[in-house]
A protein has these predicted regions:
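Acidic, polar ligand-binding/catalytic clefts
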Residues: 2, 6, 10, 15-77
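Extended ligand-binding regions for polar small-molecule ligands
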Residues: 2-11, 76, 81-82, 87-90, ...
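Ligand-binding cleft/hinge of the Venus flytrap
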Residues: 5-14, 91-112, 142-146
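Alpha-to-beta junction loops
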Residues: 13-15, 31-40, 81-82, 115, ...
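General small-molecule cofactor/ligand-binding pocket signal
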Residues: 17-19, 111, 152
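Solvent-exposed loop/turn segments at secondary-structure junctions
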Residues: 24-25, 43-47, 70-71, 89-93, ...
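A ligand-binding cleft/hinge motif common to bilobed small-molecule-binding domains
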Residues: 25, 41-50, 94-97, 122-158
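Periplasmic-binding protein-like
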Residues: 59-66, 135-139, 143-181, 197-206
């Protein structure tokens, strides 16, 4: 996010100031004009009407990974299965959310490990049937293993990141979005993304 913001500001001919804030005070900061936008893995889902947003630039949905030959194709197929997540991860939070109470109750076992590397070893060995995980981490871990494992089409929860502005600040929002799309079109977004994630995380063109 920081590299993207720096590159975006440079292209727009603006000086950038990276301002850490108290997250609980973000709305006050925007309203007071002490910050112009929030560009920090800011989830737009559930907040669509609270801010003026750019188009979403990254998907951080929580998904399920299984072995390709497991026969598991939907979340309902996880009934009676052993599901593993990283302790204190977004996937754990999503599965423990009240919206997924029935899904969680259907598992044979719900296990937690300290690292996703351990979870993938457990999946590979057959110790567990599925892993709940961020889509970005899943795609990175599955590079070169696409025939062995699969990501279910149905996410546990959908989460997209966008740049958020004070409601009504359309002019600056539109300028930032235009610049983001230019960075996506000329490959800059992909280059920055690849240096951190090992692949292009952009969903701007979708």
């Amino acid at each position: 996010d920081i590299e993207m913001a720096k590159e975006g500001a440079k292209r727009m001919g603006k000086e950038i100031k990276l301002q850490p804030i108290d997250w609980d005070a973000k709305d006050m900061e925007l309203e007071a004009g002490t910050i112009d936008c929030i560009w920090n893995g800011f989830t737009m889902n559930g907040r669509e009407e609270d801010y003026t947003w750019t188009a979403p630039y990254m998907d951080n949905s929580q998904v399920v990974v299984t072995k390709a030959d497991s026969g598991i194709t939907t979340l309902e197929d996880l009934a009676g299965k052993i599901v593993e997540v990283q302790k204190e991860s977004s996937a754990q939070s999503a599965l423990e959310d009240k919206d997924h109470a029935d899904l969680l109750a259907s598992f044979k076992e719900f296990l937690m490990v300290d690292q996703y590397n351990t979870a993938f070893m457990d999946l590979e060995s057959g110790a567990v049937d599925a892993i709940g995980i961020d889509i970005g981490v899943a795609k990175f871990q599955l590079q070169g293993k696409e025939e062995e494992f699969t990501i279910l089409d149905e996410p546990i929860s959908s989460e997209q990141y966008a740049v958020g502005f004070l409601k009504g600040n359309d002019e600056l929002c539109d300028e930032v979005e235009k610049t983001l799309k230019e960075m996506e079109a000329d490959g800059t977004f992909a280059k920055i993304s690849d240096s951190y994630f090992g692949y292009d995380v952009s969903i701007l063109g979708e």
